[in-house]
Amino acid sequence: MTTIRVKENEPFDVALRRFKRTIEKLGLLTDLRAREFYEKPTAERKRKKAAAVKRHYKRVRSMQLPKKLY
């Protein structure tokens, strides 16, 4: 469980913002959303493979020389 210590005379909004930031850095919300519903192992492999292919094409496209602009 993530905890933060509220400093003396610290507004609630600031403490809440700090809490949200720590949760975001730890990646708890993304993990929680991913585990919200059961995903079959084949569907998980398929999703990860598609993401890897997309990353690969993006990396290849960024390494290519730009087309001539004339």
UniProtKB/Swiss-Prot annotation:
Lineage, opening ranks: Bacteria, Pseudomonadati, Pseudomonadota, Betaproteobacteria, Burkholderiales
Record carries keyword Ribosomal protein: yes
Keywords carried by this UniProt record: Ribonucleoprotein, Ribosomal protein
Name of the gene: rpsU
Transmembrane spans: none
Name of this chain's protein: Small ribosomal subunit protein bS21
One GO CC annotation: ribonucleoprotein complex
Keyword Glycoprotein attached: no
Xref: Pfam families: Ribosomal_S21 (PF01165)
GO molecular function: structural constituent of ribosome
Domain of life of the organism encoding this protein: Bacteria
Family of this protein: Belongs to the bacterial ribosomal protein bS21 family.
Organism: Acidovorax ebreus (strain TPSY) (Diaphorobacter sp. (strain TPSY))
GO terms under biological process: translation
PROSITE patterns, alphabetized: RIBOSOMAL_S21
